């Protein structure tokens, strides 16, 4: 150690991070264009709600009637009604990213079905086959992964943070289950999500989806209210986004 008078720190913006630059103030002042053409949007809406057997366009998988109706209604939201609910807007956000070769990973305690039975990203056919429609929109698409995690916010968010660090070109999401319980992961949020770039010059693109706020559900069910996270904002370290319409997805 005495023979080495200086130490060099290698930039982390190498390897898989080589195409990423540091954020600037202007990045937080304007939104980039993220839309797709109406034609592509309609096409993806049909593909992402198609329940036919993979590799056999003429053979349709048999699902519970309510699931088939749900996916039929989702398709009609785009092709007929021209009005999307929250679940379909989220579905289309993922579909467009997948079509642009951006992998999407979603995990949480009830992420496959969705806490309010709204997502149904993983559906089960009558022969017990698991089917993820978003993985069948095209042959050259990116991968959609959705996992129902175990009951440990601290451990799961820590894992997803590490996954996002290794895969900066993917969208990695940790979803708090109903009631939030985000405070169970507070150490990861404080020490890594909010401050790793300042402390260790390490950026990370993990997204925390916290669908609830202060709704009178009790002390353990209101931990994701927005002011808790606003207090951790400094030097453009993160964005706090309050979605008020399905279009915000």
Give names to the regions the model predicted.
Residues 1-249:
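Flexible, glycine-rich loop/tail regions that form catalytic "lids" or insertion modules at the edges
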